[in-house]
């Protein structure tokens, strides 16, 4: 029986590397938010995460662009056959992003899907590096060339991208159209890449001031904590979610 939930630092590899039978999850660039001591100025950048299909090998010469013939569902299924990038960081980290991708054997042209968790510049500032990728930015899904397709994503209806891979609607921080990526069955359990639904471990003192809809964001946070074993936040290190068992009256 599940009881109270708490969060704690995740000890282990940096960057986070969690693998499953279907996907690996790698934090390429860890986000940060650092007060600058001048009024409310903050220097910040968002976390960038790579979701890599198991057994994927770079071969852009044989790559086929996702097709619109079968609608959004088919196009998304085709897009997740290659590397998936969750957020891109700000344009000021362009070189760092390219270098981090290269360390994983991924070139910009290899990326088949970019998921932007929300529309802030520190999270989608490098979309221009991936003109050949399908884009799911907030709730907008488009194929290369700007063909937009409806898909039906909402809080009660996730997008199923593949076995153990989903996109959830998690509104709040940036308004009503934020999304998170859920990867199930990894070596660390269920990993949820959340954008700024969680800024960092221990953000309880600050997230509401940064939220466009705190009520919706609280709902999103609770939903994520109910399933996640590891959370990848927008501006800090990944952290673990611990569910404490509640003893029954018979114990």
From Swiss-Prot:
Classify the source by domain of life.
Eukaryota
Oligomer status and interactors:
Homodimer.
Q: What is known of its domains?
A: Contains four of the five characteristic MBL-fold metal-binding motifs, with two waters completing metal coordination.
Gene Ontology cellular-component terms listed: cytoplasm; cytosol; nucleus
Family membership, please give it.
Belongs to the metallo-beta-lactamase superfamily. Glyoxalase II family.
Which positions bind Zn(2+) 2? Answer: 122-123, 196, 235
Gene giving rise to this polypeptide: Mblac1
The entry's protein name is Metallo-beta-lactamase domain-containing protein 1
Q: Where in the cell is it found?
A: Cytoplasm, Cytosol; Nucleus
Q: Which residues bind Zn(2+) 1?
A: 118, 120, 173, 196
Does the keyword Hydrolase feature in the UniProt annotation?
A: yes
> What keywords appear on the UniProt entry?
Cytoplasm, Hydrolase, Metal-binding, Nucleus, Zinc
Q: How is the cofactor bound?
A: Binds 2 Zn(2+) ions per subunit.
UniProt xrefs under SMART domains: Lactamase_B
Q: What does this protein do?
A: Endoribonuclease that catalyzes the hydrolysis of histone-coding pre-mRNA 3'-end. Involved in histone pre-mRNA processing during the S-phase of the cell cycle, which is required for entering/progressing through S-phase. Cleaves histone pre-mRNA at a major and a minor cleavage site after the 5'-ACCCA-3' and the 5'-ACCCACA-3' sequence, respectively, and located downstream of the stem-loop. May require the presence of the HDE element located at the histone pre-RNA 3'-end to avoid non-specific cleavage.
């Amino acid at each position: 029986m599940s009881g109270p939930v708490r969060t704690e630092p995740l000890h282990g590899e940096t960057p986070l590397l969690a693998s499953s039978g279907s996907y690996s999850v790698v934090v390429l660039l860890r986000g940060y938010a650092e007060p600058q001591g001048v009024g409310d100025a903050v220097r910040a950048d968002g976390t960038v995460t790579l979701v890599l299909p198991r057994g994927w090998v770079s071969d852009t010469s044989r790559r086929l662009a996702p097709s619109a013939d079968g609608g959004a569902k088919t196009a998304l299924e085709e897009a997740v056959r290659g590397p998936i990038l969750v957020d891109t960081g700000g344009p000021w980290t362009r070189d760092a992003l390219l270098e981090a991708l290269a360390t994983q054997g991924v070139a910009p042209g290899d990326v088949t899907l970019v998921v932007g968790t929300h529309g802030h510049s520190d999270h989608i500032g490098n979309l221009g590096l991936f003109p050949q990728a399908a884009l799911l930015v907030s709730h907008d899904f488009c194929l290369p060339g700007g063909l937009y397709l409806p898909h039906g994503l909402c809080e009660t209806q996730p997008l199923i991208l593949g076995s153990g891979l989903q996109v959830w609607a998690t509104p709040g921080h940036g308004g009503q159209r934020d999304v998170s990526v859920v990867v199930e069955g990894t070596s660390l359990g269920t990993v949820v890449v959340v954008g700024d639904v969680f800024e960092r471990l221990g953000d309880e003192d600050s997230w509401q001031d940064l939220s466009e809809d705190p009520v919706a964001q609280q709902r999103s946070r609770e939903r994520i904590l109910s399933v996640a074993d590891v959370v990848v936040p927008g501006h800090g290190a990944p952290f673990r979610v611990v569910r404490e068992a509640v003893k029954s009256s018979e114990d």
